[in-house]
C-alpha cells in the first residue's frame, strides 16, 4: 500500500505547495491526526519527510479513506480550498467522462446482440447486487461478491447491463466512482501487464488520470468476468504476488493479487465464474457473498418474445412452442440464446414455414438458424462463398474447443481460412462479435454457437483435414465429452449426435451441396459398443446424463435402443425437470441392465408447477424394473420420497421379475411411512443392504431387526452408518447378532452408540452362535471405558476378524487394554483399525511401538 500511494494521489496536490506551505501543512497534519484519534506519526519523521516519504508515512498509519479525508481538511485549514475544490471537481469530471464512454460502448455492444432493450430484464438482480456490494449502516469493509452459474447462462450480459445502469446513475449512487471490467478470456492474451495498464485499456483517451482514479480505492469496483478462462495457481505464496499497481506481472499473477486483496485491498470486487471453477477456488479467496445466476425466468423469456414480435398472438404462439419443449425452454434461460431462438422462429414464421418442425430438438433449431444466417435474404440457397465461410468457421470453432480458446485474433481466423474481408460479413450476420478488449479479436455469439460449429466440423471433415495438431479424432472427442474431461464442453457431444439425425443431415446436404457419409453412424455405434462394454476400464467414468442427452438429441429409435442395450450398469442423477424428460426417454429404450442407480434429489417435491408431468415421467423411469428383468443391484441415493412418489416406485419394483441381491438407500429421506420400504427388504432374497445416511426411527429399527431375525434372511452385509440410531436400537441389534446366521459385516459408524450401547453388543458377540466377521464402529463416541468389554470379544468370540475404532476417544488406558488382549494366544482378530490423530503424543508413541510387534494393528494417519 505504501508504494501505491507514493506513486500518485497526495503528491499530485502537495506539489502545488511551496516549501513554507508544505512545512505548515505538516504541522497541521500532526495536530489533525492527534485530534482524530488516528495512529500517531513521529514529528521527527514527518518534519524530515519529502512529499513521497510523507505519502508513505500517511498510508502506513491510516487507511486510504482516512488519509484522504485528513489531507483535504488540512488543505482547507491552510486556505487552499482551491486545491480541494479542484480535486473534487476533477474527480467528478473524470468519472462523468468515463461513465459516458462506458455507456456508449456497452450500449453499442448490446445493440449488436439484441435489437431490443433487455436492460430492464435484470432489475431484480441489480437490486440484489446493490444490497450485497453496498455496506449496511456503519459497515465499511470492502466486498467481494461471486456470481456463479453454468457457462453461457448470461453472467456477462448481466454484468455489462449492470455497468450501463451504473453509468446512468441508477445503482451504487455515491458508492463507486469507477467500475472497471476485466474478462479473463480477453486479458489472458496479454503476456504481462500492470493494474494501471488494464485500467488504461478501459479509458476513453490514451492517458488515464491514474493518480486520481487510484486516490480513493474504496470507491473502485473491479469486475473480473469468467474466472474459468484463466489458469490459477492456488498454491501461490503471498511473496509471489504483486503489491504495486504500477508493477508489470503475468496477467494471472496480477489478477490473483487483486483477488487475494494484495493490490488495493480497500476496493470492492464482483467476480463471475462457472460453478466448477468456483468450487476449485472458493477456499483460495475471501469472498463475502455468493449468488447463483440461473438466467432468464419464464416472464423474461416471454417478454423477449413479445418485444421481438409485433403481433402479440404470433408472439404468444411462438413462446408456447418453446414453453412446451423443456430443452429449448432451458437453453432460452441464456439471454443471448433466448434472443437467437426467438429470432429464428420469427424468421421461419415470416417466411411462411412451419416453426413446429425446427423445435423437434435443440440441435434442429440451431441447424436451421445458423444455416439461414449464411443464406442471403430472399435467396433459396447459399453462395459458394457462404458455404466456404461457414466451413472455415467450423475449422476455427473446433480448434478453439480443443485449445480452450474462445477469443480469436486475426491470425487464428486467417489460419482457418477466414480472410480480413470476411470479418464484416460474420459481424453483420451476428455469428461473431468483436471482443470488448481488442478491436482485432473476435468471439462467437455464444459458447453454444462455437460448440455447434465445432460439432459440425466432425460431420463434414476428418481431424486429418485440420492443420492444428491439437484437434483429435472423433473417438477422443466423444470420450472427452462423455467423461467431462473438458468441463466447458456443455453441448458439443449432444450437437454431434443431434446432427446425425436424418432431418439434420438433409439440411446440411442441401446447404453444402453434397452427400454426407452414412458410415459415421455405424462407426459411432461400434465405438460406443466398445466403450460401454462392462470390461472397458473407462466405462465407469462415463457421465450417464451426458450420454443420455446425446441419445435424446439424436432421437433415432433403433440406434438409441442398441446403445442403451450396450450398458449393463447405469447411474442416473436427475437435477431438474429437463433431466427427468431425457432420463425417461432413454431408460424406456433399454432392457439389459443388471445394476441400476437413481438419484432424484428433491426435484419431485420442488418442481410444484410440473408435479403432474413429473409423476408421469417418474412412472416411465420406474418402469425400468419391468423392462430389465436381470437387475440384481439397485441404488437409490440423495433422494427425497413423498408418499405418491414412493408408491409408484414400490408398485413397479414389487410387480417386477427382478431378483435383487443388493439394495442401497444412501441418504434417502422418506416424507411418508417407511413400512412399504421395509416390506421391499423382506420381499427379496437380499444379500447386501446399505442404508447409510437414511434416518431410521425406533420403530423402523424394530421392523428391520424383525426381518433380520427371520430364518430365511440371507443378508450378509448391513450398513447402518449415520442413520441416527437411538439408544433402544442396540438391544434390537444385539438380538440380531444372537439369532442371525448369515450376517458377516455390520457398520454402525457415525451413530451415538456410546459405551453402554457397545456393552450390549459385546454381550451378544461373546455368544457362540454369533456369525459376525467385521464390525465398524467409527465415530461412535466411545471412550476407554468400553475397551474391557470389547477386548473380551477378541478372545471369547472366534468369528470376529476385523474391527474399526477410528475417530473415537479411547485414550491411553483403552489402547493399553486392547493391545494386551491382542497379544493373547486365543485372539483370532485379523485387523484392528485405529487413527493416530485420536491419541495424545504418549499414546501415539506407545501405538507405534505396538505396531512393530503386532501386525493386527492398522493405523490411519489422516485427520
UniProtKB/Swiss-Prot annotation:
Keyword field contains Transcription = no
Residue intervals of the NACHT domain: 143-466
Which residues are involved in binding ATP? 149-156
BP terms from Gene Ontology: inflammatory response
An example of a Pfam family matching this protein is: PYRIN
Instruction: Give all residue intervals belonging to the Pyrin domain.
Output: 1-93
**Could you tell me which cysteines form disulfide bridges?**
none
Residues in LRR repeats: 618-643, 683-706, 717-740, 741-763, 765-782, 797-824, 843-863
UniProt cross-references to CDD domains, sorted A to Z:
Pyrin_NALPs (cd08320)
Q: Name one GO molecular function term.
A: ATP binding
Q: Cross-referenced InterPro entries, in alphabetical order?
A: DAPIN, DEATH-like_dom_sf, Leu-rich_rpt, LRR_dom_sf, NACHT_NTPase, NLRP_HD2, NLRP_innate_immun_reg, NOD1/2_WH
PROSITE patterns the record matches:
LRR, NACHT
Q: Which UniProt keywords apply?
A: ATP-binding, Inflammatory response, Leucine-rich repeat, Nucleotide-binding, Repeat
Q: In the UniProt record, does the keyword ATP-binding occur?
A: yes
So what does this one do? May be involved in inflammation and recognition of cytosolic pathogen-associated molecular patterns (PAMPs) not intercepted by membrane-bound receptors.
Q: Which family does it belong to?
A: Belongs to the NLRP family.
Query: Under which name does UniProt file this protein?
Result: NACHT, LRR and PYD domains-containing protein 4B
The uppermost taxa in this organism's lineage are: Eukaryota, Metazoa, Chordata, Craniata, Vertebrata
